[in-house]
């Protein structure tokens, strides 16, 4: 494979849609092996399946350290290493900063 990211391994969180999906597709097009790290199994599998054999879906909740540790372990086990990380995942909610608790801030 040729391209600017040939034989590189990229993990993209929130890669099941929007900007994360665009990153996954762009890096894949440039030769990267891509880990689609996504909490939504349906959209994550869709993107990884469309990208093909150089892509891997791993169900990942970035708000849970055990989940991100497990995702990283699967990525390294499958591809041998991680070269690039795109922290794209986001959460949505109707909150005001003044009303956030320490638990809310830890989750963010």
Say what each PLM segment does.
Residues 2-35:
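Canonical Rossmann dinucleotide-binding motif of NAD(H)/NADP(H)-dependent dehydrogenases/reductases
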Residues 41-42, 59-72, 102:
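The beta1-alpha1 cofactor-binding region of Rossmann-like NAD(H)/NADP(H)-dependent oxidoreductases
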């Amino acid at each position: 494979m040729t391209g600017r990211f040939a034989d590189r391994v990229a993990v993209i969180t929130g890669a099941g849609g929007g900007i994360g999906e665009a990153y996954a597709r762009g890096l894949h097009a440039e030769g990267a092996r891509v880990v689609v790290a996504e909490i939504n199994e349906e959209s994550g599998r869709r993107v990884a399946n469309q990208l093909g054999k150089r892509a891997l879906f791993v169900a990942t909740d970035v708000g849970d350290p055990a989940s991100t540790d497990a995702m990283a372990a699967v990525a390294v086990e499958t591809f041998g290493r991680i070269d690039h990380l795109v922290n794209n995942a986001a959460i949505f909610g109707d909150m005001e900063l003044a009303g956030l608790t320490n638990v809310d801030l830890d989750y963010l």
